[in-house]
Amino acid sequence: SAGKFIVIFKNGVSDDKIRETKDEVIAEGGTITNEYNMPGMKGFAGELTPQSLTKFQGLQGDLIDSIEEDGIVTTQ
């Protein structure tokens, strides 16, 4: 896998589109480990394959608000 990422959708993306996107992650061999469904923040955490990651990077600004690597953030 490309690694663990948190994918946040833009406001106004339909639940159907979000479900479809998560299904694609699984179909491509990735996993969904957590889902976020709060007012103003919908998305998921999971392990993405390199092809899913590339596809999502192409959707940024359109469907996806942000993609962040899911890891422990350390500050120096």
From Swiss-Prot:
Keywords: Acetylation, Protease inhibitor, Serine protease inhibitor
Name under which the protein is recorded: Serine proteinase inhibitor IA-2
InterPro entries (UniProt xref): PBI_I9, S8pro/Inhibitor_I9_sf
Described purpose of this protein according to its UniProt entry: Specifically inhibits an intracellular serine proteinase (proteinase A).
Residues bearing PTM N-acetylserine: S1
Family, per entry: Belongs to the protease inhibitor I9 family.
GO biological process terms held by the UniProt record: vacuole fusion, non-autophagic
Key word Acetylation present: yes
Entry GO MF terms: serine-type endopeptidase inhibitor activity
